[in-house]
């Protein structure tokens, strides 16, 4: 591959220091909160509160391990690190070479900038520590030390993964109007999980009625929104004079109590320091004889950087879909762990997988995904495919952070989650042939009686628009050996080979590689109908669902000879899957070169679309496409937010190739989209990509952060195009692309950190 590097000449002493110091992947380990609000307290004040028995008074992101990881970002002048030196001390004035009383790593020759572990035995619980780092570039010259960061170790180490405290952002309702009933009506603009605070002036004792809801009917809160769309009301007594009143949100009997719940899983409870929350956008108040002078909503959410990402394009629907899905990741972070919506508030692997990828693409935040993944290792849910998805979650964590701590901590559980114990003589796995055992289920972290294949959800129900089959599984014919389950099994084995390799477990890596090859061969032998050119639902089935072909395509199982026919079948089924299934459908379409078809699904205005959610007044993604297809759907489900990651990973084409983004791809798949630009967060810094797509040329601007190299693909309008880099002609004769692609050719080159203008014309 051709490689281009930007060469910068620097004066001696011009190097800047590293930035963005993270401890356990958390950048802000200093801010102390109380009840979700930042305070002026410092880390030592937290220790004092602990000593006084007031551990619930102050919150901070504590380090819950004696061997925390350190990460940083390189200054722009250092395109690639050749060495680092870390200092850790018990006081900031000791952060000097020769004085650091906890640890001095010495000069370490290493390109790694994330996941550097402190040796064991050096830290104590309930103690404040300070650290800094300097790095050397390829010339061996070191930068100055970075401004120090500090962290507080937990009072008792559990060996878990650290996360940030939940925060509250107080919003004031605007506009506020009076409706035909004489009630005050307030619109906060977007739905959020929050509480309510009112400033009220009353002439005497009075009682206000407060209505909260996600949906409106004109300028009133919709009291009967249907499905599981939220509506509630409260009676609020007030006393004479002016005062501020805060509603105490009632706990829900289903999502706010620890008890066995349906399939042996439990809801996540809100911590006492923030209190119970309710999802709503609108507030309507029957004021009686009192005057309400201010309506505020404290919104509860996880740490969030709105400016970490952006996307805009020439298509207004696509822009609206992106904004919907990005905001959904923020709004649904209220529990500090990924949950499946307000109805249950339970972590599920499938929800977490889409939430994880989408969160990575909209914010440089990694700890809520890591915490959720680790939580699920011992809180597995019932679907077979969800059990297998844990391996995908764990690999994504390593791929996006470069920190292998989760892989090490959960390796044995991940091995069990490949479900190799269910392998039959034909090389495939089955949950229906008597191989499930209590021991296997416990090793998978599942405490129910058995796991069951799901394919998609709901499996049956109302007839779909534009498809013949009921439910969201496209009429899937479930049997003993199912194509979707074994496609997931293959993907889990494939990734476990990589995980074992990272952890230097060579025998395991060889085993998983061999099993993956066997499963791929078995699926293509038993499930691929070579006459029809697509996959049947399982052994003995005569049904050919969308899912049976889209998962093998998304997971790279389809033989080259059958790619075109499999893609034809996938295209023919439209959006015959749920909002969850759309993640893998769009992955398959983009990876197969069907970028125009994928763009059409993303920008569809039909009932099975994200636009349908927007058009019906929602600002957070739904659990399903429409109540017609899932009658009990809710309006606060992040598993409906796949476009947040699809637009970045596939349409803009920005993905990590090597762990910690040491190498990435930038491969736009524009279809007929005229223009787009995006800022993509990574642990190394922002990637910026913009393109202009015309019949005669494809213009592209990219900015690549330090610490990585990018394999860049530039679509070309014709086979006779030439590539220009920063104004100079670089190459002619582009490579032919997949016959399904909107562009007949493309150029590939490797770029080092810097900013580039690329033009294929």
Q: What are the roles of these predicted feature ranges?
A:
Residues 1-16:
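Fungal secretory targeting signals
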């Amino acid at each position: 591959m051709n490689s281009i590097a930007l060469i910068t000449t620097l004066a001696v002493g011009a190097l800047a220091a590293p930035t963005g110091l993270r401890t356990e992947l958390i950048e802000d380990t200093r801010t102390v909160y109380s009840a979700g609000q930042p305070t002026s307290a410092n880390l030592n004040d937290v220790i004092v509160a602990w000593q006084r028995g007031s551990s619930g008074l102050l919150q901070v992101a504590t380090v819950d391990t004696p061997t925390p990881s350190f990460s940083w970002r390189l200054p722009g002048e250092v395109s690639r690190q050749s060495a680092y030196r870390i200092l850790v001390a018990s006081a900031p004035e000791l952060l000097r070479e020769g004085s650091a009383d906890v640890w001095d790593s010495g000069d370490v020759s290493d390109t790694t900038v994330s996941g550097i572990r402190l040796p064991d035995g050096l830290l104590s619980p309930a103690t404040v520590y300070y650290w800094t780092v300097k790095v050397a570039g390829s010339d061996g010259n070191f930068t100055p030390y970075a401004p120090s960061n500090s962290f507080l170790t937990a009072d008792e180490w559990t060996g878990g993964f650290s996360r940030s405290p939940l925060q509250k952002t107080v919003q004031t309702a605007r506009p506020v109007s009076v409706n035909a009933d004489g009630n005050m009506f307030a619109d906060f603009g977007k739905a959020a999980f929050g509480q309510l605070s009112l400033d009220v002036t009353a002439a005497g004792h009075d009682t206000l009625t407060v209505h909260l809801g996600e949906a409106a009917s004109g300028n009133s809160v919709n009291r009967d929104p249907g499905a599981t769309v939220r509506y509630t009301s409260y009676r609020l007594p007030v006393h004479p004079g002016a005062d501020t009143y805060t509603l105490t949100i009632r706990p829900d009997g289903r999502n706010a109590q620890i008890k066995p719940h349906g399939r042996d899983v439990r809801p996540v409870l809100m911590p006492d320091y923030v209190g119970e929350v309710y999802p709503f956008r609108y507030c309507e108040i029957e004021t009686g004889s009192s005057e309400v002078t201010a309506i505020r909503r404290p919104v509860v959410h996880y740490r969030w950087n709105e400016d970490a990402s952006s996307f805009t394009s020439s298509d207004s629907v696509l822009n609206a879909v992106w904004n919907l899905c990005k905001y959904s990741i923020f709004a649904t972070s209220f529990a500090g762990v990924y949950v499946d919506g307000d109805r249950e508030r339970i972590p599920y692997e499938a929800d977490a997988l889409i939430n994880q990828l989408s969160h990575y693409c909209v914010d440089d935040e990694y700890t809520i995904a890591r915490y959720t993944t680790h939580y699920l290792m011992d809180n597995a849910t019932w679907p077979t495919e969800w059990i297998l998805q844990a391996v995908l979650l764990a690999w994504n964590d390593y791929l996006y952070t470069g920190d292998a701590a989760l892989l090490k901590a959960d390796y044995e559980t991940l091995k069990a989650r490949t479900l190799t114990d269910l392998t039959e003589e034909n090389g495939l796995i089955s949950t229906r042939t008597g191989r499930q055992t209590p021991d296997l289920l416990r090793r998978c972290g599942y405490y129910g009686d058995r796991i069951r294949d799901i394919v998609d959800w709901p499996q049956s129900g109302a007839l779909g628009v534009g498809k013949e089959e009921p439910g969201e599984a496209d009429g899937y014919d479930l049997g003993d050996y199912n194509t979707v389950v074994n496609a997931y099994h293959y993907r889990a084995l494939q990734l476990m080979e990589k995980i074992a390799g990272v952890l230097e477990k060579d025998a395991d890596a060889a085993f998983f590689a061999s099993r993956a090859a066997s499963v791929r061969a078995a699926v293509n032998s038993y499930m691929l109908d070579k006459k029809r050119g697509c996959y049947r639902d399982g052994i003995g089935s005569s049904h050919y669902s969308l899912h049976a072909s889209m998962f093998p395509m998304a997971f790279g199982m389809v033989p080259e000879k059958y790619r075109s026919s499999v893609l034809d079948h996938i295209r023919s089924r439209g959006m015959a899957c749920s909002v969850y299934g759309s993640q893998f459908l769009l992955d398959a379409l983009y990876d197969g070169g069907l970028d125009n078809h994928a763009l059409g699904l993303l920008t569809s205005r039909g009932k099975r679309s994200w636009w349908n959610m927007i058009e019906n007044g929602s600002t957070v993604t739904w659990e399903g496409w429409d109540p017609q297809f899932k009658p009990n759907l809710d309006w606060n489900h992040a598993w409906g937010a796949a476009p947040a990651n699809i637009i970045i990973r596939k349409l803009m084409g920005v993905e990590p190739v090597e762990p910690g983004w040491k190498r990435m791809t930038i491969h736009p798949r524009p279809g007929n989209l005229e223009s787009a630009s995006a800022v993509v967060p990574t642990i190394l810094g922002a990637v910026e990509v913009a393109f202009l797509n015309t019949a005669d040329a494809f213009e592209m601007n990219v900015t690549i952060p330090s610490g990585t190299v990018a394999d860049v693909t530039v679509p070309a309008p014709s086979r006779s195009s030439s590539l220009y880099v920063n104004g100079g002609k670089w190459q002619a004769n582009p490579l032919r692309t997949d016959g399904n692609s909107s562009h007949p050719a493309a150029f590939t080159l490797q770029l080092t950190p810097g900013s580039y203008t690329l033009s294929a014309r």
